[in-house]
Amino acid sequence: MILDATPIITSLLDTDAYKLHMQQAVYHHYSDIPVVAEFRCRSDERLGEYATTLRHQVDMMADLSLTNEEFGYLQSLPFFKNDYLQWFKHFRFKPEQVHIATTADNQLTIKITGPWREVILWEVPLLALVSEIVHRARSPQITADDAVIQLRKLIDIFYRDAAEQQIDLADFKLMDFGTRRRFSYDVQRAIVDELKNHFPYLIGTSNYHFAERMQLAPVGTQAHEWFQAHQQISPELANSQRAALQSWLDEYPDQLGIALTDCITMDAFLRDFDMPFASRYQGLRHDSGDPIEWGEKAIAHYEKLGIDPMSKVLVFSDSLDFQKALVLYKHFHKRIRLIFGIGTRLTCNIPNITPLNIVIKLVECNGKPVAKLSDSPGKTICEDDEFVDKLRKAFDVPLVRQAC
């Protein structure tokens, strides 16, 4: 087998912004904590045949390092402290942390082990690699132009629907969340460039590389792993979500204040999200469950606490496309501020192409299991039934069908 000597990932910054934001917090607070993360394919795909190509690409990532220009760019941002940046300047990927194998039925398995401060950066480029390797092999005829043509059609429909429903788009805000399951690097670059130049409602991208290259705002706060890890960091399981929320404020007291709500369901989150947290965090992010029901709960919670919802923001990011975003915008507009993060349906929305439904999630921290009890049962991650039961009881979460 002849392997392509050209690396797909060519920049440390070709990742989601929240990975660097979380990495800095981990570096400062939990530097030596060991974790394990694992790959999941949520569909019936047989991806084992791509293991050798993936291994080759992962090995080439050992050569990546921050350029002087990238270092200067990160220094110019208000989020990062100098001690972290000096450490990150010398950061190198360690391919030996990534264990890639194939099962008897041709499933791809990926397991990442090591210190959290290092493992944290593997998820996004690994998923982008799997996606691009598979799509290159299956659909070599597809170009970035195909994706841009489709995007223009979707935007035309978006404008037409908004006009027909007399929706004022003045407050519509879009963010690109498309790195991890993009068709390819070239497609994401073309899509973000098209949006920047022709869609006035784009406010930023979650990808630091494209943010730097295209002078866009980098966007992102924290992911499920932040809350999951605290399940085995916090001395008391029932207090772990509050510990995660507080630790984030300790690192970022007055910025990056969007909290993710569905690591242990929205209802359990809101029980912990009391006045001190609700007043300090700028808003909430939706990533599973019914988005309208979720948004109504968020607004009601703010109102119950005496907080004006229009002083807060809801970020919707669960399987969004332009049509879903417009429905949500119409429903919540002028009741609370809104931002829409669209990912796969921006960067892998091409006729006759099926995006991969793949994730990499934390499964262990400090040698013990962690779990995610999503608002969508199919997105629940569990490795240990006994721990899931403990977590459910600690947070008073009803038993739901698990997807392990």
UniProtKB/Swiss-Prot annotation:
Keyword terms, alphabetized: Ligase, Phosphoprotein, Pyridine nucleotide biosynthesis
Post-translational modifications: Transiently phosphorylated on a His residue during the reaction cycle. Phosphorylation strongly increases the affinity for substrates and increases the rate of nicotinate D-ribonucleotide production. Dephosphorylation regenerates the low-affinity form of the enzyme, leading to product release.
Catalytic activity line of the entry: nicotinate + 5-phospho-alpha-D-ribose 1-diphosphate + ATP + H2O = nicotinate beta-D-ribonucleotide + ADP + phosphate + diphosphate
InterPro entries: N/Namide_PRibTrfase, NAPRTase_N, Nic_PRibTrfase, Nic_PRibTrfase-Fam, Nicotinate_pribotase-like_C
Pathway: Cofactor biosynthesis; NAD(+) biosynthesis; nicotinate D-ribonucleotide from nicotinate: step 1/1
Broad class of enzyme this protein falls into: ligase
Gene Ontology MF, one: nicotinate phosphoribosyltransferase activity
Pfam families: NAPRTase, NAPRTase_N
Family: Belongs to the NAPRTase family.
Function of the protein: Catalyzes the synthesis of beta-nicotinate D-ribonucleotide from nicotinate and 5-phospho-D-ribose 1-phosphate at the expense of ATP.
Cross-referenced NCBIfam families: NAPRTase (TIGR01514), PRK05321.1 (NF003704)
HAMAP family: NAPRTase (MF_00570)
Protein name: Nicotinate phosphoribosyltransferase
Gene name as annotated: pncB
